[in-house]
Amino acid sequence: NMSRLLEEKDALLTLLTLLSLSHGFYTRFGALQLLVLLVEHRRLEVQDYVLTAPGGSSSVLQCLEAAPSSSTEIIRNEALLLLPQLVRDNADIQKIVAFEGAFERLLDIIVQEGRIEGGVVVQDALDGLEALLLQNVSNQNYFRETLSIPLLGPLLFYPPPIPPQAPEHARQEYATHQRAFLLQEWDEQKLTNAQILLRCIRHLIDGQGD
C-alpha cells in the first residue's frame, strides 16, 4: 500500500497540503500520522519529495505552533515526532528546516514546557534540536551566529554568569542560584532531557559535521 501511495504523483503533495491551518484537527492529525508512518518505512523517498516540493518542510514546521491547552498541542506533539525522522541523515533538509525557523520554534517549545523539567514533550523537542545539529557544520554555525551557545545554559536551570563588577547583592543572589542548581532533584525524565541538551551543546562546541 505504501508503494502504491508513493507511486501516485500528487499523493505526498496532498498530504503536505492537508497540514495547513485551514484544515480541521482530525484532517491535520491524520495526515501527520500517515507522514510519520511513511517516513518510518520509506524515509529516503519522502525526503527526496520534501526537498523538491514547494513549501514541503514549512508545512511541517507550521504544525509546531500551538495554543496552550488546545487541540493544536496534539498536532504539535505529533509534528515533534515527525521532525527528527524527516531530517535524519539528510544535510540538505536539515539546512532548509533550520533556516525556516526550526531552532527558534523548538527552543520556544522547550521553554514553554518547563525546560529540562518539561517531560516527554521537551525530550521530543530536544531530539529535533539534536537531529538538526548532528554532523551538520552549516547548522552548527547558524545556531552559534544567530542564537549562541549560552542561550542553552538556562534550559538546564544553570544561572547565567554575572559581570566581574557586579555589586555584592548580585553576587549573593548568583550564589543562591548556583546552590539551587546543585541541589535540584533529578528524576529519570529530567536526566534524559539534560543528557540530550548536553549532547546538543557538545555538537556546537566540537563543530564536527559534513
Question: Which residues does each predicted region cover?
Answer:
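Flexible, disordered linker segments and immediate boundary regions flanking tandem C2H2 zinc-finger modules
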Residues: D108-I110, P154-F157, P167
